[in-house]
């Protein structure tokens, strides 16, 4: 996403250039999102035992996050263009952190699934603008390639780290801690983002907002993701319910 930025620094040495610090902060934020996608899988048996989920209900601990995350990525990226990428990143990170605490404190099925849905919203807002911010901070091709390499390594390795972290936290503490641990990390990343990541200026809500289009596209994407994770997975693609949901999703697009 293209945005106007303040100068992130002039020193070209990675050790002293503020841009490289900003890159590490953005990668840390992205790592939180990647970890969350895998850390929950390890804790599902403990969550099911503690909260009494049925097998089909347990799937929504994962699916609630996927539906909101996948459905809102596009509109979150557009919000970055309108309001400024850093502003959307910070708002998404705050929402993700608060909802992580809500997940960790959840005492029933409804509270956990609802908090997971909100977590997906925050994850979408943070993820959608991260790559564009990195590209904007590193316009020179050689530096941009290095920055993208660091970002790609963090994103690809986060899944393995999440599986390990999920197992350790669940075994040594409880499943609640796979969510609560996001709180201190989120606070630190939020503070460092405000300090090191350059502020961005969006084009303005009044110049580029298409409310009806945003509602239709977001509804279509969320319905499409829901179709994949629910009726298609449970009933198959040949089921009437799956086909109707998929058709409505296409019509909304």
Q: Would you name each region that the model predicts?
A:
Residues 2-195:
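Transmembrane-helix bundle of Major Facilitator Superfamily
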């Amino acid at each position: 996403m293209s945005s106007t930025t303040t100068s992130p620094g002039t020193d070209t040495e990675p050790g002293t250039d503020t841009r490289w610090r900003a890159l590490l902060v953005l990668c840390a934020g992205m790592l939180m999102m990647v970890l969350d996608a895998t850390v929950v899988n390890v804790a599902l048996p403990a969550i099911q035992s503690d909260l009494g989920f049925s097998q089909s209900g347990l799937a929504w601990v994962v699916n609630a996050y996927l539906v909101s995350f996948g459905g809102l990525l596009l509109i979150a990226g557009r919000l970055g263009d309108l309001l400024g990428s850093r502003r959307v990143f910070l708002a998404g990170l705050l929402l993700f952190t608060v909802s992580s605490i809500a997940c960790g404190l959840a005492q029933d099925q409804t509270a956990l699934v609802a908090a997971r849905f909100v977590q997906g919203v925050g994850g979408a807002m943070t993820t959608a603008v991260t790559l564009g911010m990195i590209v904007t901070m590193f316009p020179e091709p050689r530096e941009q390639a290095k920055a993208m390499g660091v970002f790609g390594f963090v994103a690809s390795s986060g899944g393995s780290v999440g599986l390990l972290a999920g197992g350790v936290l669940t075994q040594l503490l409880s499943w609640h801690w796979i969510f609560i641990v996001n709180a201190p990390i989120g606070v630190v990343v939020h503070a460092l983002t405000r300090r090191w990541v350059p502020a961005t200026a969006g084009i303005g809500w009044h110049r580029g907002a298409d409310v009806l289009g945003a509602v239709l596209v977001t509804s279509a994407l969320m319905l499409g993701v829901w179709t994949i994770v629910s009726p298609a997975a449970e009933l198959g693609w040949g089921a009437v319910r799956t086909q109707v949901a998929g058709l409505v999703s296409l019509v909304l697009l």
